[in-house]
Amino acid sequence: MGAALALLGDLVATVSEAAAATGFSVAEIAAGEAAAAIEVQIASLATVEGITSTEAIAAIGLTPQTYAVITGAPGAIAGIAALVQTVSGVSSVAQVGYKFFSEWDHKISTVGLNQQPGMALELFNPEDYDILFPGVNTFVNNIQYLDPRHWGPTLFSAISQAFWHLVRDDLPRLTSQEIERRTQRFFRDSLAKFLEETTWTIVNAPINLYNSIQNYYSALSPIRPSMVRQVAEREGTQVTFGHSYSQSIDDADSIEEVTQRLDLRNKEANVHSGEFIEKTLAPGGANQRIAPQWMLPLLLGLYGTVTPALEAYEDAPSKKKRRMSRGSSQKAKGPRASSKTSYKRRRRSTRS
């Protein structure tokens, strides 16, 4: 027993020195993770740089003794465990320790699972149970939150937590939505009141271009410029074709008369001033909000309350000719034919 303890002490001291030299923990060296990492480094260096394993060990800063301790620590632990089993009969402790270090990521104990099948662990999927039994998750959550033995404090704690989550998560979201809604409503209301209270003026600028084009083509004379030039040459006068001749050129006696009439028309005052739309007060003196009929679809559109009747009024319903079938046309022609025949019969009767 003393020899086993001495070997174990020497192994612990050696592993501790190797851990201090390499930076790995004792558990990593005992589990073999340090040896695996060092072997990967050595293999990569030997493959990339084309050096031997001894040179690779020296390149990463390890001595052959330290490398031997790191690679032989797991086997030495297993050998000491077997020695302790033969000497003192405490093999279970060594076996469990060696298995713990070799399988470091194992976190669930499997002792007694074969002897007690009812202790086996299974995955819990609450979604499946909620599909089979709707509402079971809510019931389970309430049971977990409320303790039947101390239902008062647990109920107060659950309510306070729910209120805190409401204040922390839901209240800022609701507040931002309400602020956004109020801002939009205020902007639309302000714009609608501005459109109601402002002074509107009729402006014909967009249609002036079309009116001028219409006037130009309507004022063109049916007489060609070549004919006008011939008349001017015959009378010995000069004609400037920059002028647009009026419709009365046909009844003019000479080119001078045409030019005089053109100058007189240009001197006439051409009024393009706008007319203000008169504001009317609310009927009955109730000081209600009023708006012209042509502005009503715009204001209701800002408030989002456009009715189908206003849409039809604004867009103007499409006028489609109703097609008549042959049967309906024949039926329509029937009374006319009968009236004609009766008229003919009456004429015949009068002749006879």
Swiss-Prot record:
It holds the Pfam family Polyoma_coat2. A motif (Nuclear localization signal) lies at residues 316-324. This is Minor capsid protein VP2. It comes from Simian virus 12 (strain wt100). Residues 313-352 are annotated as: DNA-binding. GO terms for cellular component: host cell; host cell endoplasmic reticulum membrane; host cell nucleus; membrane; viral capsid. Belongs to the polyomaviruses capsid protein VP2 family. GO terms for biological process: monoatomic ion transmembrane transport; symbiont entry into host cell via permeabilization of host membrane; viral penetration into host nucleus; virion attachment to host cell. GO terms for molecular function: channel activity; DNA binding; structural molecule activity. A lipid is attached at residue 2 (N-myristoyl glycine). Residues 273-308 are annotated as: D1. The chain crosses the membrane at residues 290-310. Residues 312-352 are annotated as: Disordered. Residues 342-352 have a biased composition (Basic residues). Keywords: Capsid protein, DNA-binding, Host endoplasmic reticulum, Host membrane, Host nucleus, Host-virus interaction, Ion channel, Ion transport, Late protein, Lipoprotein, Membrane, Myristate, Transmembrane, Transmembrane helix, Transport, Viral attachment to host cell, Viral ion channel, Viral penetration into host cytoplasm, Viral penetration into host nucleus, Viral penetration via permeabilization of host membrane, Viral release from host cell, Virion, Virus entry into host cell.
